[in-house]
Amino acid sequence: MSGVQKPITLLVYLSTYQLVNLLTTPSTNTFAFMHYTLKKSLGQHFLKDENVCRKIISALGKQKFERLLEIGPGGGALTKFLLNIDGIDFKAIELDEEKVNYLSRAYPELNGKLIHEDFLEACAPFEQEFIIIGNFPYNISSQILFKILEWKEKVPAVIGMFQKEVAQRIISKPNSKS
């Protein structure tokens, strides 16, 4: 093996104003999935606008992949789109038992694909290369990225939404204040 490491592509859909607006303002394009509680301790925030989900899914369409892992599917906003992608091996990992129960009921096609586990403690769910997607929990976004770096040989791309401050740190130059 050569000493050259493959770079990980990180595609981030980021719009703090839009996210705040989506979380606080009713819309005709919102999901009706709030059959459970948001847990601040888990950094939970859920997408409610299908247009934002479509933009994240659109970024996924620019990648070639056979396996896909969704981190923290929550209420299934992205999951419902991901389940419609043909010809891939899809899995989702969710820590919150309440969300796992909801997802299992709402999306029976997740049977055998939903992992009830803490992502930060999980082993790679695939032996081969896979893409990671998600609307990442705010309070552990950095830890998620460090965990993904442990799998850097298997993960060529990460696509999703991060909190603005986390995204700014990701793209900042070394030794900068960000």
Residue ranges, per PLM feature:
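Catalytic cores of RNA-modifying enzymes
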Residues: 25-178
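Intrinsic disorder
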Residues: 2, 10-17, 22-23
